[in-house]
A protein has these predicted regions:
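Extended, highly charged clamp/arch subdomains and adjacent linkers
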Residues: 4-23, 27-30, 176-457, 461, ...
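Long, contiguous domain-sized segments
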Residues: 1-196, 213-217, 383-384, 399-404, ...
């Protein structure tokens, strides 16, 4: 396997660099006087100075010795500045979009996929181009500490006609979303102008436009504004300038080429070609250097890696005694053994409220019958909900609505009998997806049923009219879980320690996308899980405002430990391990608060770890030996160059990446590149000294990676393994849904 990571070769452990004491005034003065030849950056109370192009005799500041890896932040800043200045020297016609992550557009005509179809007077003014991104990382793979560059490729619109030009062409700008472009002082022709999404144009007078922003109406020069680079906005302009037919043709080319440009095999080839151009000249490595003796080269071939550990697919358990197990697919276990909690599940005869539009009652009742009793000729759903999940009698109470309006649905819900239903199944039209969150009946119906403590299973009219064994099988699984059942659990990893796993997710609620928009982050604290994946303390599921999440977490944690210690018979002196799956890096002050809480629960020895799980990172894994797999009825291979599920690399003692979707898990060849998730154990940052805390932290990355991998098999929304563990999947869903309701 190979990473999109190109190692940097530094042949010294220490280096010398000039420094001065930091002040804002002095830093500004130095940049003003010497910015053409020197780089200046701050670290703490010190200004660090790199002489790239001035004479060696020009000295500024006093010389200081630094360790290449012990002072990694300083080394990293020096590498970034030298890379930037060398790039500008070698490619003077390229203006980078950003300093860091370093981004620039390809200058090759072949990388603009709409160039040949555009009219001549729009060529190079409008484009859909390859955007190249370079980021720096310090890794310690297999004990080898080194820096390296990560290369990624995206495709972005270019539209460099100002609103002044569009206005002169009589293009209607009223109501159009616009960006304000500002060239930062001293960076003309060095960096592209900074663009900020400010709002919509409401009025134009002469050379100025009034823009509705989050600060109210503000006035801008038309020459400083550009339309927001979205498919919708650019499509509208192309229709105006050419024709609807031509605009549709241009946009269709982009859509048709999407599978090709994101093909993993081609992506790998493009990344390696970019590395050769950036890091070599006619096959010879480029020497990135300054006049002070700091220098490095970069490998033009990506780093080859092997799996750090073997991640194992868990065994699925279907009875409390762990005598009924299966090692392949949990669906096979359910068909053979029934659900894990069959002997103790107390809702054996669920009453289910079913609501549909009167025009689809025939198909809806057929759907319910097939859901309950199964499809006799099918492979996966012969038994149906009732027999597969060992239920005695599933009773449906079907009610009709005249129209698909909120009032009609709420009326049907209010009419349910005194015998409160255990669950509701509600048919809704596909058109609900086009509603805004605020007016969407889906969220309002869900909120009403939530207030009545009735779980709900929505099904779209399309599925009701055209359901298969696959959709019925998944819906039955979801229904059993929503009734409170446990379809299967995982084996606990043998340990004398007690363990709880807590998921904390989040979602952003923004008024709009304009700069300065009012936004709220909603945090969802999911049900606590035991190490075998059983959900504990269901009443603790909630969402809270971001500023209150840590206080709520501590309260839930304290109550949960008290409750579970009694329920599970913990003894004084037991070691209890708390694994938090959390959406954000934790602050040092939050480590302090947790450690204080732990000291307050003195009867147990508590160890804990905060772990972030994310797919928003720049790292990719390639397997050049993977030639792809074909699906039944489709000869086009999918997943070329994508590693198998469970492939993994430990980037350092705290960070690893794990491939969750391999070639076999992809649905089609159109999926494109599948990124691994990044798992990172969070530790206090900076000059932090708390010896007591160090003894409380749990550092076993191998254990945590295996547990997270196993928990991806615990999403009861589907029988297929998920990309993220159930802890994060459900906590993110909770915060998203409750935030919208």
């Amino acid at each position: 396997m190979q990473l999109n990571y190109f190692p940097i070769n530094i042949e010294f452990d220490k280096f010398q660099i000039f420094t001065e004491p930091f002040s804002e005034e002095r830093l500004a003065e130095l940049r003003n006087l010497h910015n053409t030849t020197h780089s200046f950056f701050r670290n703490g109370d010190t200004i660090f100075i790199s002489n790239k192009d001035a004479h060696e005799n020009v000295t500024i500041g006093k010389i200081a010795e630094q360790s290449t890896y012990d002072n990694a932040n300083i080394t990293a800043s020096l590498i970034k500045h030298l890379f930037f200045r060398t790039f500008k020297d070698r490619f003077p016609n390229h203006t980078p979009v950003d300093f860091y992550p370093f981004r620039f557009f390809s200058g090759q005509q072949k990388d603009d996929i709409i160039h040949n179809i555009l009219p001549d007077n729009l060529k190079n003014r409008i484009a859909y181009k390859k955007l190249i991104e370079v980021q720096l990382r310090l890794t310690e793979i297999n004990g080898n500490k080194q820096f390296g560059f990560l290369i990624n490729i995206k495709r972005n619109w270019i539209f460099d006609k100002t609103c002044a030009e569009l206005n002169a062409e009589n293009y209607n700008l009223i109501g159009v979303e616009v960006l304000y472009a500002e060239t930062l002082p001293g960076l003309s022709n060095i960096l592209a102008p900074n663009e900020e999404f400010v709002g919509e144009i409401t009025e134009i007078t002469g050379t100025k436009a009034k823009v509705s922003t989050n600060k109210g109406e503000e006035e801008y020069e038309l020459k400083e504004l550009f339309i927001r680079k979205t498919k919708f906005n650019i499509g509208n302009y192309l229709t105006f300038f050419t024709s609807q037919q031509k605009s549709d043709e241009i946009l269709r080319i982009i859509e048709n080429k999407r599978e090709d440009i994101y093909n993993p095999k081609k992506l790998y080839a493009e990344i390696t070609n970019i590395a050769k151009a950036l890091f070599t000249d006619k096959g010879t490595p480029i020497l990135f250097q300054n006049k002070d003796g700091f220098c490095f080269t970069v490998n033009a071939t990506p780093l080859t890696v092997l799996n750090t550990i073997e991640l194992k697919t868990p065994t699925f358990i279907f009875d409390p005694a762990a005598t009924k197990t299966i090692n392949t697919y949990p669906d096979n276990g359910l068909n053979n053994f029934g659900p894990y909690d069959s002997s103790i599940f107390d809702i054996k005869s669920p009453n289910i409220l079913c609501i549909c539009n009167k025009t689809v009652r025939g198909n809806f009742t057929q759907f319910l019958s097939n859901l309950k009793d199964g499809l006799p000729q099918s492979k996966y759903f012969q038994k149906g909900l009732q027999k597969k999940y060992d239920l005695h009698n599933v009773a449906f109470d079907v009610k009709e609505v005249q129209t698909n309006t909120l009032s009609e649905y709420l009326k049907a819900i209010r009419e349910y009998d005194d015998n409160k239903p255990h669950l509701a199944i509600i048919e809704i039209p596909e058109s609900f997806k086009s509603h805004s969150d605020q007016s969407n009946p889906y969220y309002q119906i869900k909120a009403k049923l939530l207030s009545l403590e009735i779980p709900v299973q929505f099904v779209t009219t399309r599925i009701v009219n055209n359901h298969s064994e696959y959709s019925l099988n998944s819906i039955a699984l979801q229904i059993y879980a929503k009734l409170g059942g446990t379809p299967w659990v995982l084996p606990t990893q043998r340990s004398v320690d007690r363990e709880l796993v807590i998921g904390i997710g989040h979602s952003w609620l923004r008024k709009n996308q304009y700069a300065g928009a009012e936004s709220n982050r909603v945090v969802g604290i999911t049900t606590f899980l035991s190490s075998d994946g059983q959900y504990l303390l269901g009443d603790k599921v909630k969402d809270v405002a971001f500023e209150n999440y840590f206080e709520e977490l501590l309260k839930s944690l304290k109550q949960s430990i008290q409750h579970l210690s009694f329920e599970q018979g913990w003894s004084d002196g037991d070691t209890v391990r708390l694994i938090f799956h959390i959406f954000k890096p934790i602050k040092n002050v939050e480590f302090d608060v947790i450690s204080q809480l732990i000291k307050d629960i003195a009867q147990y020895k508590i160890k804990f770890a905060f772990v972030t799980i994310s797919n928003k990172h720049p790292i990719m894994l390639f397997d050049t030996n993977q030639q792809g797999v074909t699906s039944y009825g489709n000869n086009i291979p999918k997943g070329e160059f994508i590693p198998n599920r469970a492939s993994n690399v430990f980037l350092d003692a705290e960070t690893c990446i794990v491939q969750m979707l391999g070639a076999n898990e992809l649905k089609t060849s159109k999926h494109g590149m599948s990124k691994p998730i990044q798992i990172k154990i969070r530790t206090p940052q900076g000059n932090y000294n708390n010896c007591e805390l160090n003894n409380m932290l749990f550092y076993d990355l191998s254990y945590i990676a295996q547990q997270i991998f196993s928990f991806t098999y615990l999403s009861w929304r589907s029988f297929l393994p998920a990309e993220e563990p159930a802890t994060m999947k459900y906590s993110n869903l909770i915060s998203k849904l409750l935030g919208k309701m």
